[in-house]
A protein has these predicted regions:
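Radical SAM enzyme [4Fe-4S]-AdoMet core and its adjacent flexible, acidic
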Residues: 134-146, 153, 157-241
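A cross-family glycoside hydrolase active-site/sugar-binding cleft signature
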Residues: 11-13, 62-66, 98-102, 122-126, ...
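Conserved radical SAM core fold
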Residues: 30-31, 70-72, 103-108, 120-142, ...
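Short, conserved SAM-binding segment of the class I
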Residues: 46, 50, 83, 147, ...
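Aromatic/hydrophobic pocket-lining residues that form the small-molecule binding cavity
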Residues: 40, 44, 77, 148, ...
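Glycine-enriched alpha-helix->loop->beta-strand junction motifs that scaffold or abut catalytic
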Residues: 115-121, 190-192
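Conserved alpha-helical substructure of the radical SAM core
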Residues: 1-112, 116-117
């Protein structure tokens, strides 16, 4: 039930900037049609104070580091996590942290940190190389698949081994209505926790999904269901959100 005035979860936009230029980006390239900037630690501290002060008797609190690309402001992410943990001890709270990333800046140091501090990590990739490179180019127009795929595999493997949550987050558009093939592609790469969702866009955009696309979309979901059920209970099982 809704409790008036109670806040137990927060999406913290630590970066209004991004190093990709995804065609369908709801944030207009990460800056939400505003000046490119990153959140200061002082603002992040105020956000943590706010959620603690407004959480009532809730013990378990959640913060999702988001953007833009949050790893462009990684130092503030780390400082905010430490501050939240310190404050949580004072007030008898427990924080769970999630970070959503386009995976470009991931390296061994960052991956180790995420495995230590993040309850969940959301890894953005849209599917097969030709699909991802079309929908998620870099700022200079080049494809991003080759920049991120090894990073994604490394994160997934390490978190699988540690029993930690992650999931692959893909977006399908008019250009890949056969998105069940992208889910199969993820599986073939060793990825087991998967999600794909439809783009939300104005119908005038060439990638927008329209009513006429629904039969093909339903066919893809039917095929995806068959694939899922075939592998359920076997060593080829995967989770789909």
């Amino acid at each position: 039930l809704f409790e008036k005035g109670i806040v137990k979860a927060m999406c913290l936009h630590v970066s209004h900037d991004c190093n990709l230029a995804c065609r369908y980006c709801f944030a207009s390239g990460g800056n939400f049609n505003m000046k490119k900037e990153v959140m200061s630690f002082e603002t992040a501290k105020k956000a943590i104070d706010f959620i603690i002060n407004n959480s009532g008797n809730k013990v378990h609190l959640e913060v999702d580091f988001f953007g833009g690309e949050p790893l462009l402001n990684f130092d503030v992410v780390k400082k905010t996590v430490e501050y939240a943990k310190e404050e949580a001890k004072k007030y008898g709270k427990i924080f769970r942290f999630t970070l959503t990333t386009n995976c470009v800046l991931l390296n061994d140091e960052i991956i180790d940190y995420l495995n230590k501090e993040m309850y969940n990590v959301v890894l953005s990739i849209d599917g097969r190389k030709e699909i991802n490179d079309f929908t998620r180019p870099t700022a200079n127009g080049k494809g991003s698949y080759d920049l991120i795929i090894e990073n994604i595999k490394k994160v997934a493997k390490s978190r699988d081994e540690l029993g930690l949550d992650y999931y692959i987050r893909g977006t399908y558009t008019k250009h890949n209505l056969d998105f069940y093939k992208d889910v199969e592609h993820f599986y073939d790469l060793g990825l087991r926790q998967l999600s794909v969702e439809s783009v939300v866009a104005d119908e005038k955009e060439d990638y927008a999904i329209t009513k006429e696309d629904l039969p093909e979309i339903m066919e893809s979901y039917d095929k995806l269901t068959d694939i899922y059920l075939e592998r359920l209970g076997t060593d080829k099982e995967f989770r789909f959100f």
